[in-house]
Amino acid sequence: MTEIPSSFVLPDPEWIYRVGIGQDSHRFLPDEDPKPCILGGIIFENTPGFEANSDGDVVFHAICNAFSSVTHKGILGGLADELLKTKGITDSVVYLQEAIASLKPTQRVSHLAITIEGKRPKLLPQLPSMRKRIAEVLHIPLDSINITATSGEGLTAMGQGYGVQCFCVLTIMEYCRY
């Protein structure tokens, strides 16, 4: 049996990484509905809002779900519903702030990868504004966030223009001593 040289022995880890995945989707309201379309905290003009109890921001909702997959604390369908019921809060920024607050003091957001599928609205011109808004809410550097967008070539209901879907992968660094 080959002996492992001491130079290959790893030190006790001080940082571990946890990865969360989140998803959300909503159907558009009729075109004449006045509810605004909000994605990543940005209002998209000339596009109807989403069928949702909240503002329907599928980007912030997917991020909330990614936090929940790391922290095991239900934000959407749990805390967000309670905030809506007791205080009338529909702003997804508030839900995302609650998700951030669910982190342990030893945990930090390292990176966020987001992909959005939908035929409308046209996302490309607003991606920089969306990244900036997400960075502000999460209190992380802009270069820790990336967003891609696709129409899905019309293969799904989202790509056919019925709604928008978002997937998110969240990387959390956690300081721990074993």
From Swiss-Prot:
Belongs to the IspF family. A divalent metal cation binds at residues 24, 26, 61. Involved in the biosynthesis of isopentenyl diphosphate (IPP) and dimethylallyl diphosphate (DMAPP), two major building blocks of isoprenoid compounds. Catalyzes the conversion of 4-diphosphocytidyl-2-C-methyl-D-erythritol 2-phosphate (CDP-ME2P) to 2-C-methyl-D-erythritol 2,4-cyclodiphosphate (ME-CPP) with a corresponding release of cytidine 5-monophosphate (CMP). The keyword Metal-binding applies. It holds the Pfam family YgbB. This is 2-C-methyl-D-erythritol 2,4-cyclodiphosphate synthase. The gene is ispF. It catalyses: 4-CDP-2-C-methyl-D-erythritol 2-phosphate = 2-C-methyl-D-erythritol 2,4-cyclic diphosphate + CMP. Keywords: Isoprene biosynthesis, Lyase, Metal-binding. Its cofactor is a divalent metal cation. 4-CDP-2-C-methyl-D-erythritol 2-phosphate binds at residues 24-26, 150-153. One of its GO terms (biological process) is isopentenyl diphosphate biosynthetic process, methylerythritol 4-phosphate pathway. Its EC number is 4.6.1.12. Homotrimer. Pathway: Isoprenoid biosynthesis; isopentenyl diphosphate biosynthesis via DXP pathway; isopentenyl diphosphate from 1-deoxy-D-xylulose 5-phosphate: step 4/6. NCBIfam families: ispF. It comes from Chlamydia trachomatis serovar L2b (strain UCH-1/proctitis).
